[in-house]
C-alpha cells in the first residue's frame, strides 16, 4: 500500500496538502545594489513548483553568503509573475534564497518513469499524510481497503509519509540524492508543530545547510538533530496508528524499507 501517492484526484483537490521540500538557489554574486535570483533555475519544473500559498517572508530565507548574515525581510521581495526574488545587495557579495516548493511529481515515480522510459503514464502527485485533511482521508481509505479485502492477511506498506531527498535538475538528471535526507519532510504545518516542540523558531538553514542538505558527510547541527528527533517521534506515532488499523482487521503489517522511510529508519 502506498500512503503518500497513487491518488491524483485527492492531491489535485487538496493542493495545500501536497508534499513540500526545502530548496536552495545557486549562489549568485551581486554586481551592484540589486540582484534578482530566479528560484527554479537548475530544478525540474515538472517535479517541483514554488509554494506561493504560504507567506515567503515567514518561511523563506535570503542569506548573504559572503558574511553569513541573514538578509532582513524588508530588503527583499518575491516577484511571483517572474518567479524571481529581488534583493537589496552589497556589491560583489554572494547571495542565496532558501524556499519551499511543492513536490508535484513523486520522486520515486519520476525515477521509475525516467529509468523505464515510460511514455504515457500519468505523473503521480504527492500528498502529505501528516496534515489533517489528508490524514483523515488516508486512515478511512485504509479501513475501507481492509474491509474490502478480507482474503489478504499480510499488508505491506510500500510507503509511509516522507521520501528521502531525491531532487532532479532541469535536464531530468539527479541533482541531489540523500538516502537519509530530510529536506522533503517539511511544510508550514509540520514546522509550526516543531517550533512548539523545540521551543525556538525554525530556520530554513537548519535544512538546506549552506547547500549541503545535511548530507551524511556533514556534522549535523543541534537544530537538525532536534528536527530529526521530532520527525521520528511524530512519524513513528502516526505509522503506529496505521499499523493498528491493519491489526484491528486481523492482518499482519510489514514495511518496505527503501523510499518513503524518513522518520522510521531502523539505523
Describe each model-derived feature in a short phrase:
Residues 1-267:
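Glycan-processing catalytic domains of CAZymes
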Amino acid at each position: 500500500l502506498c500512503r503518500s501517492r497513487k491518488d491524483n484526484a485527492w492531491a489535485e483537490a487538496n493542493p495545500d496538502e501536497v508534499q513540500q521540500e526545502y530548496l536552495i538557489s545557486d549562489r549568485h554574486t551581486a554586481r551592484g545594489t540589486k540582484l534578482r535570483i530566479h528560484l527554479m533555475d537548475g530544478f525540474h519544473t515538472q517535479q517541483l513548483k514554488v509554494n506561493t500559498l504560504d507567506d515567503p517572508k515567514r518561511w523563506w530565507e535570503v542569506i548573504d553568503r559572503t558574511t553569513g548574515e541573514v538578509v532582513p525581510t524588508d530588503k527583499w521581495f518575491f516577484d511571483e509573475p517572474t518567479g524571481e526574488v529581488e534583493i537589496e545587495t552589497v556589491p560583489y557579495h554572494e547571495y542565496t534564497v532558501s524556499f519551499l516548493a511543492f513536490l508535484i511529481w513523486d520522486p520515486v515515480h519520476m525515477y521509475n518513469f525516467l529509468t523505464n522510459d515510460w511514455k504515457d503514464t500519468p505523473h503521480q502527485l504527492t500528498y502529505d499524510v501528516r496534515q489533517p485533511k489528508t490524514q483523515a482521508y488516508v486512515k478511512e481509505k485504509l479501513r475501507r481497503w481492509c474491509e474490502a479485502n478480507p482474503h489478504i492477511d499480510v499488508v505491506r506498506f510500500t510507503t509511509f509519509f516522507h521520501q528521502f531527498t531525491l531532487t532532479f535538475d532541469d535536464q531530468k538528471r539527479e541533482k541531489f540524492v540523500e538516502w537519509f535526507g530530510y529536506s522533503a519532510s517539511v511544510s508550514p504545518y509540520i514546522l509550526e508543530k516543531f517550533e512548539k516542540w523545540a521551543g525556538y523558531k525554525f530556520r530554513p538553514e537548519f535544512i538546506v545547510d549552506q547547500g549541503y542538505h545535511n548530507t551524511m558527510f556533514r556534522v549535523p547541527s543541534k537544530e537538525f538533530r532536534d528536527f530529526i528527533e521530532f520527525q521520528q517521534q511524530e512519524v513513528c506515532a502516526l505509522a503506529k496508528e496505521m499499523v493498528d488499523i491493519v491489526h484491528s482487521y486481523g492482518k499482519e503489517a510489514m514495511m518496505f524499507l527503501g523510499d518513503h522511510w524518513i522518520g522510521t529508519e531502523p539505523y
